[in-house]
């Protein structure tokens, strides 16, 4: 799926495996602004996984999309807070609630 992020076309790839994307061995998703891709891991139930993986996958996707917005806005290269995972998590987690206000 392709999305427009501040005028840049990003490709979102879901259900990706560690075999195709080795970074998924460490992360459930990542954003690569050098090739405008957002990669989301294939979420599989296990004894250690969260119960609602659909909810979690959406949260991971929002997290990576926010990284892409910060990157495309230029803030990634000019500000430490734009790379701060806690800030990105905050917006990814709270965005659905914020959207209701707008």
Residue map of PLM features:
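Short, Lys/Arg-rich amphipathic alpha-helical interaction segments
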Residues: 97-102
